[in-house]
Amino acid sequence: MAPNDTISDMLTRIRNACAVRHPTTQVPTTKMTRSIAQVLKEEGFIEGFEETGEGVQKYLVLTLKYKDKNRQPIINMLKRVSKPGLRVYSNCKDLPRVLGGIGIAIVSTSKGIMTDREARRQNVGGEILCYIW
């Protein structure tokens, strides 16, 4: 059965894989999950991702990133903000700073999916999808 909220599903799969220190995790491919994975890669939260599968069953295989030999995950917390039942929007002036700029907020804007810093730089607001730190 396909999940209704693909973003929450993606964040949960990443959170669970980090908790048990798996090197990779699979998430179903959508335009949104691909864009979020690209932002995570650009910000250094994951090492990379690749698309696998064919036809209807396509997946993104995310390669997770860990610190030092103790394999502490780079991603400490993933928090979904805007949900299907309660959307959260913000203009560019009111975009939140996550942990004083240490973390990021992923924002869906009219110019695509980007971080809160990039949205402020481009002077656009949008839907706050999630916080990551």
UniProtKB/Swiss-Prot annotation:
<keyword id="KW-0699">rRNA-binding</keyword>
<dbReference type="GO" id="GO:0006412">
    <property type="term" value="P:translation"/>
</dbReference>
<dbReference type="Pfam" id="PF00410">
    <property type="entry name" value="Ribosomal_S8"/>
</dbReference>
<dbReference type="InterPro" id="IPR047863">
    <property type="entry name" value="Ribosomal_uS8_CS"/>
</dbReference>
<keyword id="KW-0689">Ribosomal protein</keyword>
<keyword id="KW-0694">RNA-binding</keyword>
<dbReference type="GO" id="GO:0005840">
    <property type="term" value="C:ribosome"/>
</dbReference>
<dbReference type="InterPro" id="IPR000630">
    <property type="entry name" value="Ribosomal_uS8"/>
</dbReference>
<comment type="function">
    <text>One of the primary rRNA binding proteins, it binds directly to 16S rRNA central domain where it helps coordinate assembly of the platform of the 30S subunit.</text>
</comment>
<dbReference type="InterPro" id="IPR035987">
    <property type="entry name" value="Ribosomal_uS8_sf"/>
</dbReference>
<dbReference type="GO" id="GO:0003735">
    <property type="term" value="F:structural constituent of ribosome"/>
</dbReference>
<dbReference type="GO" id="GO:1990904">
    <property type="term" value="C:ribonucleoprotein complex"/>
</dbReference>
<comment type="similarity">
    <text>Belongs to the universal ribosomal protein uS8 family.</text>
</comment>
<comment type="subunit">
    <text>Part of the 30S ribosomal subunit. Contacts proteins S5 and S12.</text>
</comment>
<keyword id="KW-0687">Ribonucleoprotein</keyword>
<dbReference type="GO" id="GO:0019843">
    <property type="term" value="F:rRNA binding"/>
</dbReference>
<protein>
    <recommendedName>
        <fullName>Small ribosomal subunit protein uS8</fullName>
    </recommendedName>
</protein>
